[in-house]
Amino acid sequence: MEITVSEIQVESKDETRSAEVRPQDERQEEKASMLCFKRRKKAAKAMKPKASSKAADAAKKCPPEARASDQPQRPGGAWDSIKRLVTRRKRSESSKQQKPFKAKLQSEINAEDANPSKKKAKSRLKIPCIKFSKGEKRSNHSKIIEDSDRSVKVQEAENLVTKTQTQSDDQATKSKSPQDVREDVSQKGDDEVCESNVNNSITSPGEKVISVELELDMGHSAIQRGTLILEKDTEMLEEKQSIQPQHVSPLEASDTEQELPVGSEVPPSSAVPDQQILEEARNGVLESGPDWKEHESREIVVEESKPKDTELSQELDFQENEITAEKPKPEESKRMEPIAIIITDTEISEFDVKKSKNVPKPFLISIENEQVGVFANDSGFEGRTSEQYETLLIETASSLVKNAIQLSIEQLVNEMASDDNTINNRLQ
């Protein structure tokens, strides 16, 4: 088990080295001739105290680059093993030579620190500093490019703001309040863009670049908020213009916008849902059951016939009571307290309907048209109507009795609950 673990560890190390070598080779291809200089003077860079962290990283990265250049050029065979021995000896000799060279460089660096006037004459030691300053300039250049991209986005946002302003001016030239809001937003956006341009002029050090980026982000977000506000204003104006021509002429609409821009929005919006509610109520009435249709047809026929007998008037009243009693919901039935009175009306009307035979012919014909569609003798009409009345009476009476029982049970339960609450409160 130990042998396998050691083998796995070795393989992982090789893999990590190869993974480190590949991005460095890519960097070599990008920087090309600059790296040759760095390889020759890596010892000088590594020992300098004033060199930046980037210099140290580059100096550390140089030896694996050399290894990477050697590794892919190794073919197999005994000749290669001899070459490797020779290259190892050369490396050991070069490392021995580098040690006194490093000591010399340290003495020279200390002398330069003591005499800063001599730095100008020694151009060899300035080369790596120049290289690293070039690298910093490149990073600043990339940041400046990013800033320029963001400034382009800010300019595009400004163009969108101006376009929305022109569209809104064309749509509603006389609306004042939304235009004032837009002018304020556009002024804020211009101020923020000016600040970002001023800060773009100072982008040489890294800290100022970061501050410029933050300010650009804030300006961009503020301009986005402004565009959102402008889009909302345009939507409100479009809704106004779509609703007002239905009710008011264009001249009157412009006058009302000048006087009461907020009040002109409310009445059409409140009128539309009222119309929808009325239409829904009408549809609900039309979609109700056949009993309601029978009731409407009966009422129309009765208005045309206008009977003079008191018994017929009682029957019609009873029919109305039946239909209104069948429709109420449980909430409405709870509110209807005089349920017993309705039951007494049904009993009286049952007695009247059974004994009454003075029913007009058009009244019976209307019922027959809705249900059968075939005309028959008067005796058939009378028999069928009496049966229908009986069934309606039984259904209504049963529904009313059920509602009354439910209400009584609920009242008892509520009373018991209230009594329990009072007892608990007293005990507490």
Curated annotation (Swiss-Prot):
Entry keywords, A to Z: Calmodulin-binding, Endosome, Lipoprotein, Membrane, Palmitate, Phosphoprotein, Synapse
Region (RII-beta subunit binding domain): 389-410
Sequence positions bearing Phosphoserine: S92, S94
Alphabetical GO biological process terms: negative regulation of adenylate cyclase activity
One GO CC term, this protein: postsynaptic recycling endosome membrane
InterPro entries listed in its UniProt record: AKAP5, AKAP_WSK
Alphabetized GO MF terms: adenylate cyclase binding; beta-2 adrenergic receptor binding; calmodulin binding; GABA receptor binding; glutamate receptor binding; molecular adaptor activity; protein kinase A regulatory subunit binding
Pfam families: WSK
Compositional bias segments (type: Polar residues): 161-170
Lipoprotein is among the record's keywords: yes
Major localization listed first in the record, in broad terms: membrane
UniProt comment concerning the protein's domains: RII-alpha binding site, predicted to form an amphipathic helix, could participate in protein-protein interactions with a complementary surface on the R-subunit dimer.
Protein name: A-kinase anchor protein 5
Organism: Bos taurus
